[in-house]
A protein has these predicted regions:
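Acceptor/aglycone-binding surface of glycosyltransferases and processive sugar-polymer synthases
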Residues: 64-68, 72-82, 87, 99-182, ...
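Structured catalytic core of nucleotide-sugar glycosyltransferases
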Residues: 1-130
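Short conserved micro-motifs on helix faces and helix-strand junctions that flank
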Residues: 8, 66-68, 159, 232, ...
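Residue-level signature of catalytic and energy-coupling elements of molecular machines
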Residues: 5, 23, 79, 94, ...
Length: 314
């Protein structure tokens, strides 16, 4: 049996050599054959040069180079489309996700004898700040309710799965891909696997707080119509509030004979309605933009080159 490990790489020149070394030492001693599908996501450092040298020396390494940076989601799908083993895995190149855990997850999947289709890793102890941890927890809770999908809380893209799951993931044609939502949407039987991430070998994480927030919004917009329902609810609440205010105003004038000053209240109402309208238009625009981009049917990525070993692995 063979497992194909898909490894997205972006500016990982300081990590890829050690990653391949560790991964090879782990799987060379295992009962499985393996292949490392290293996807260079338009790196602007020497990542591709390092990967090319590794591919020429190691028959288990295959390299896919993008024409530019298309993002991790595109890198993952490119690697999965190149995968043909009985099992596939997604793992980062910075060794925070250990190859030893990938092997343990594979063994759990194989030994389940069909009981599970996927083993998904989640962080048992998080090393992030309290704020980011809480924000991620809130996101998973909102996403699970809004998208009606059972996403494993704090699960990463680090997982091992069968060819059937891989084919199901590849079959989804959308351009705006949100892997955590896709993994949850395709379903199958998933076994959670707790792990503690190691310290990053070299460099810094590519994820900032702003990029995490943007990624969360992408997930919500890609997998649920909750924001559109929010617009509907906002319109209903605003209409009810306006009717109540009109009723109270008429009551004060006709019954109590009060002179209701209108300038300040009118200004507040106009600003409130204007803000609600702009918010609604913005949400509708986000969905319309996605329809527009999906209609273009552009490829998720463009491959500049592929590199395989000149040495046979037979």
């Amino acid at each position: 049996m063979r497992i194909d490990l898909v490894v997205p790489c972006f500016n990982e020149e300081d990590n890829v050599d050690e990653f391949v070394k560790v991964c090879s030492s782990v799987f060379d001693e295992s009962e499985f054959s393996y292949r490392l599908i290293m996807v260079d996501d338009g790196s602007n450092d020497a990542t591709f040069s390092h990967l090319t040298d590794l591919a020429h020396k190691n028959p288990c390494v295959e390299v896919i180079q993008f024409s530019r940076n298309f993002g991790k989601e595109a890198a993952m799908i490119a690697g999965l489309e190149a995968s043909s083993g009985e099992y596939s895995a997604i793992i980062d190149a910075d060794l925070q996700q250990r190859p030893e855990d990938a092997l343990a997850m594979l063994r759990i999947l194989v030994q389940s004898e069909g009981e599970y289709d996927c083993v998904a890793a989640y962080q048992e102890k998080r090393k992030e700040s309290w704020l980011i941890t809480k924000m991620k927890g809130m996101f998973y809770s909102i996403f699970a309710k809004a998208a009606r999908s059972q996403a494993i809380p704090h699960a990463s893209d680090f997982r091992v799965f069968t060819a059937t799951v891989r084919d199901a993931i590849i079959s989804l044609p959308e351009s705006y891909r949100f892997s955590k939502g896709i993994f949850a949407w395709v379903g199958f039987r998933v076994k959670p696997y707790a792990y503690v991430p190691s310290d990053r070998l070299q460099g810094e994480s590519k994820w900032s707080l702003s990029s995490l927030i943007r990624y969360a919004f992408e997930g919500i917009l890609s997998f649920t119509t909750l924001p559109l329902r929010f617009v509907t609810y906002l319109g209903a609440v605003t209409s009810i509030g306006a009717l109540l205010y009109a009723f109270i105003t008429v009551l004060q004038i006709l019954v109590f004979g009060k002179d209701v000053p209108g300038y300040a209240s009118t200004l507040v109402v106009v600003l409130l309605l204007g803000g609600a309208q702009l918010l609604s238009i913005g949400i509708l625009g986000e969905y319309l933009a996605r329809v527009y981009m999906e209609g273009k049917q552009r490829p998720l990525y463009i491959v500049r080159s592929r590199v395989c070993s000149e040495v046979s692995d037979e």
